[in-house]
Protein backbone atom coordinates (compact mmCIF):
# COMPACT_ATOMS: atom_id res chain seq x y z
CA UNK A 1 0.00 0.00 0.00
CA UNK A 2 1.35 3.37 -0.94
CA UNK A 3 0.19 6.96 -1.06
CA UNK A 4 1.89 9.38 -3.42
CA UNK A 5 4.16 12.13 -2.15
CA UNK A 6 1.31 14.48 -3.06
CA UNK A 7 -0.51 13.40 0.10
CA UNK A 8 2.49 14.41 2.20
CA UNK A 9 2.86 17.73 0.36
CA UNK A 10 -0.84 18.45 0.81
CA UNK A 11 -0.86 17.67 4.53
CA UNK A 12 2.20 19.78 5.27
CA UNK A 13 0.88 22.74 3.28
CA UNK A 14 -2.59 22.50 4.78
CA UNK A 15 -1.00 22.36 8.24
CA UNK A 16 0.62 25.76 7.68
CA UNK A 17 -2.67 27.08 6.35
CA UNK A 18 -4.39 26.26 9.66
CA UNK A 19 -2.31 28.84 11.50
CA UNK A 20 -4.65 31.73 12.21
CA UNK A 21 -1.71 34.04 12.93
CA UNK A 22 -0.81 34.12 9.27
CA UNK A 23 -3.10 36.86 8.06
CA UNK A 24 -3.24 36.24 4.34
CA UNK A 25 -3.88 33.75 1.59
CA UNK A 26 -1.04 31.32 0.95
CA UNK A 27 0.81 31.33 -2.35
CA UNK A 28 1.95 28.06 -3.85
CA UNK A 29 5.41 29.49 -4.52
CA UNK A 30 5.83 30.47 -0.85
CA UNK A 31 4.67 27.07 0.39
CA UNK A 32 6.91 25.24 -2.09
CA UNK A 33 9.92 27.42 -1.26
CA UNK A 34 9.42 27.04 2.49
CA UNK A 35 9.33 23.25 2.23
CA UNK A 36 11.87 22.82 -0.55
CA UNK A 37 9.47 21.10 -2.95
CA UNK A 38 8.59 21.52 -6.62
CA UNK A 39 6.26 24.44 -7.38
CA UNK A 40 4.98 22.60 -10.45
CA UNK A 41 4.08 19.45 -8.55
CA UNK A 42 2.58 21.40 -5.65
CA UNK A 43 0.41 23.30 -8.16
CA UNK A 44 -1.02 19.99 -9.34
CA UNK A 45 -1.69 18.96 -5.74
CA UNK A 46 -3.45 22.26 -5.04
CA UNK A 47 -5.59 21.85 -8.15
CA UNK A 48 -6.87 18.58 -6.70
CA UNK A 49 -7.44 20.15 -3.27
CA UNK A 50 -9.40 22.99 -4.87
CA UNK A 51 -11.44 20.63 -7.04
CA UNK A 52 -12.37 18.59 -3.96
CA UNK A 53 -13.54 21.70 -2.10
CA UNK A 54 -10.81 21.77 0.56
CA UNK A 55 -9.25 24.96 -0.82
CA UNK A 56 -10.48 28.03 -2.61
CA UNK A 57 -8.37 30.35 -4.71
CA UNK A 58 -8.17 34.04 -3.96
CA UNK A 59 -7.39 36.14 -7.05
CA UNK A 60 -5.27 39.27 -7.13
CA UNK A 61 -1.85 40.55 -6.15
CA UNK A 62 -2.18 39.27 -2.60
CA UNK A 63 -4.07 36.19 -3.74
CA UNK A 64 -3.34 32.58 -3.14
CA UNK A 65 -5.27 29.82 -1.45
CA UNK A 66 -7.35 29.52 1.70
CA UNK A 67 -9.10 26.67 3.45
CA UNK A 68 -12.82 26.49 2.68
CA UNK A 69 -13.70 24.90 6.01
CA UNK A 70 -12.42 25.06 9.57
CA UNK A 71 -9.49 22.72 10.32
CA UNK A 72 -11.65 20.54 12.59
CA UNK A 73 -13.84 19.62 9.63
CA UNK A 74 -11.04 18.60 7.25
CA UNK A 75 -9.96 15.03 7.89
CA UNK A 76 -6.90 13.15 6.72
CA UNK A 77 -9.32 11.00 4.72
CA UNK A 78 -10.64 14.10 2.93
CA UNK A 79 -7.08 14.98 1.93
CA UNK A 80 -6.09 11.46 0.87
CA UNK A 81 -9.22 11.10 -1.25
CA UNK A 82 -8.68 14.53 -2.81
CA UNK A 83 -5.18 13.55 -3.92
CA UNK A 84 -5.51 9.82 -4.59
CA UNK A 85 -9.18 9.51 -5.52
CA UNK A 86 -11.79 7.24 -3.99
CA UNK A 87 -11.18 3.99 -5.85
CA UNK A 88 -10.69 1.04 -3.49
CA UNK A 89 -7.07 0.09 -2.79
CA UNK A 90 -7.81 -3.55 -3.61
CA UNK A 91 -9.24 -4.40 -7.00
CA UNK A 92 -10.74 -7.89 -7.06
CA UNK A 93 -10.66 -9.43 -10.54
CA UNK A 94 -12.66 -12.50 -9.43
CA UNK A 95 -9.95 -14.83 -10.73
CA UNK A 96 -11.48 -17.63 -8.71
CA UNK A 97 -14.01 -17.94 -11.56
CA UNK A 98 -11.16 -18.71 -13.96
CA UNK A 99 -9.97 -21.90 -12.27
CA UNK A 100 -9.12 -24.51 -14.84
CA UNK A 101 -11.30 -27.20 -13.23
CA UNK A 102 -14.50 -25.11 -13.28
CA UNK A 103 -17.25 -25.35 -15.86
CA UNK A 104 -17.54 -21.65 -16.64
CA UNK A 105 -21.00 -22.14 -18.17
CA UNK A 106 -22.39 -23.68 -14.96
CA UNK A 107 -20.78 -21.84 -12.05
CA UNK A 108 -22.33 -22.64 -8.69
CA UNK A 109 -23.62 -20.04 -6.25
CA UNK A 110 -20.29 -20.32 -4.42
CA UNK A 111 -18.69 -18.56 -7.38
CA UNK A 112 -21.47 -16.21 -8.44
CA UNK A 113 -23.38 -15.09 -5.33
CA UNK A 114 -20.85 -15.49 -2.53
CA UNK A 115 -18.33 -12.64 -2.35
CA UNK A 116 -14.66 -13.45 -2.66
CA UNK A 117 -13.37 -13.78 0.91
CA UNK A 118 -10.06 -12.17 0.01
CA UNK A 119 -11.95 -9.13 -1.29
CA UNK A 120 -14.07 -9.01 1.87
CA UNK A 121 -11.00 -8.97 4.13
CA UNK A 122 -9.21 -6.35 2.04
CA UNK A 123 -12.24 -4.05 1.91
CA UNK A 124 -12.79 -4.43 5.67
CA UNK A 125 -9.16 -3.49 6.30
CA UNK A 126 -9.48 -0.48 4.03
CA UNK A 127 -12.65 0.59 5.82
CA UNK A 128 -10.85 0.46 9.18
CA UNK A 129 -8.06 2.63 7.76
CA UNK A 130 -10.63 5.09 6.39
CA UNK A 131 -12.34 5.33 9.77
CA UNK A 132 -8.99 6.07 11.44
CA UNK A 133 -8.09 8.72 8.85
CA UNK A 134 -11.55 10.26 9.17
CA UNK A 135 -10.95 10.70 12.90
CA UNK A 136 -7.67 12.63 12.41
CA UNK A 137 -8.24 16.24 11.36
CA UNK A 138 -6.12 19.26 10.49
CA UNK A 139 -7.08 20.71 13.88
CA UNK A 140 -5.72 17.59 15.60
CA UNK A 141 -2.52 17.83 13.53
CA UNK A 142 -2.08 21.54 14.36
CA UNK A 143 -2.48 20.78 18.09
CA UNK A 144 0.04 17.93 17.94
CA UNK A 145 2.59 20.03 16.08
CA UNK A 146 2.08 22.98 18.43
CA UNK A 147 2.78 20.70 21.40
CA UNK A 148 6.04 19.45 19.87
CA UNK A 149 7.40 22.39 17.86
CA UNK A 150 9.66 24.78 19.75
CA UNK A 151 7.86 28.09 20.28
CA UNK A 152 10.67 30.04 18.63
CA UNK A 153 10.41 27.96 15.45
CA UNK A 154 6.65 28.49 15.35
CA UNK A 155 7.15 32.28 15.60
CA UNK A 156 9.80 32.22 12.88
CA UNK A 157 7.48 30.25 10.60
CA UNK A 158 4.66 32.77 11.05
CA UNK A 159 7.10 35.63 10.48
CA UNK A 160 8.42 33.98 7.31
CA UNK A 161 4.96 33.67 5.78
CA UNK A 162 3.75 37.10 6.94
CA UNK A 163 6.79 39.09 5.79
CA UNK A 164 7.99 38.09 2.33
CA UNK A 165 10.23 41.17 2.15
CA UNK A 166 12.29 39.91 5.09
CA UNK A 167 13.49 36.87 3.14
Where are these regions (language model features)?
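Short, hydrophobic-biased segments on the C-terminal half of alpha helices
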Residues: 46-47
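Conserved segment of winged-helix/HTH DNA-binding domains
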Residues: 71-98
Amino acid sequence: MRFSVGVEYAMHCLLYMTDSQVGKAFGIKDLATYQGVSVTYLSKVFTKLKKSGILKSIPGVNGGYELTRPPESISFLDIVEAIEGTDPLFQCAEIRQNEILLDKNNLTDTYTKCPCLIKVVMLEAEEQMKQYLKYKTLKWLREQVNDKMPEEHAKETIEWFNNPKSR
